[in-house]
C-alpha cells in the first residue's frame, strides 16, 4: 500500500517537531565544537582545554569542517521539515538527519578516548564539549526519527499495525 501524498495534521505537526528538535541539535553541535572536549595535562605543564574550533595544534582546525557541514546540512533538512513541501523531500530530509545524528554522536564519542587516556606523562579528562556534542547528535537523530516515523504512518490510522493490505483490484 503506497503512502498517500496528502499529509495529515499529525504528520505536519510531527515533521515540525522533528525539524525543531534537529535545529536544537544543530545549535548544540556548534556549542559542542566551541567548548573544550577534554582537559589534558602533559607532565607538569598547565592543563590545556582543546576544542574542535581551537585544538591548540597546528593544522587540526580542519577537523572543524566535518561538524560545520553537519550543522549546515541539518539546518537545511530541518527547514525542509518545517515548511510544507513534497512528502518525498521530507522523507529524504528525515533520513539525512538520522545519518548526521549518528555520525555526530560517534564523532564526539571518539573524544572520550582522548579525555580518559592517562599514562605517566599524560593525564586527560572528558570536557563538557564532548557531552554536549553527543547530546546534540542524539537530538539531530531524534529529529530525523520523529519525522520519519510520522511519514511512515498511513493517513487516518493511529498505528501502522492497523493497516491491512488492500484486495487486488
Spans of model-derived segments:
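Compact integral membrane and secretory-pathway proteins
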Residues: 2-169
Amino acid at each position: 500500500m503506497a503512502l498517500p501524498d496528502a499529509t495529515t495534521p499529525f504528520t505536519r505537526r510531527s515533521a515540525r517537531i522533528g525539524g525543531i528538535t534537529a535545529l536544537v541539535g544543530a545549535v548544540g553541535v556548534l556549542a559542542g565544537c566551541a567548548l573544550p572536549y577534554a582537559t589534558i595535562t602533559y607532565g607538569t605543564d598547565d592543563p590545556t582545554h582543546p576544542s574542535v574550533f581551537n585544538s591548540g595544534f597546528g593544522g587540526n582546525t580542519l577537523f572543524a569542517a566535518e561538524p560545520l557541514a553537519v550543522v549546515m546540512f541539518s539546518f537545511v533538512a530541518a527547514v525542509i521539515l518545517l515548511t510544507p513541501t513534497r512528502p518525498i523531500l521530507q522523507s529524504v530530509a528525515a533520513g539525512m538527519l538520522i545519518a548526521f545524528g549518528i555520525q555526530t554522536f560517534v564523532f564526539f564519542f571518539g573524544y572520550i578516548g582522548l579525555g580518559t587516556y592517562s599514562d605517566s606523562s599524560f593525564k586527560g579528562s572528558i570536557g563538557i564539549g564532548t557531552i554536549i556534542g553527543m547530546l546534540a547528535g542524539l537530538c539531530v537523530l531524534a529529529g530525523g526519527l520523529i519525522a520519519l516515523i510520522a511519514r511512515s504512518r498511513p493517513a487516518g490510522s493511529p498505528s501502522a499495525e492497523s493497516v491491512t493490505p488492500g484486495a487486488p483490484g
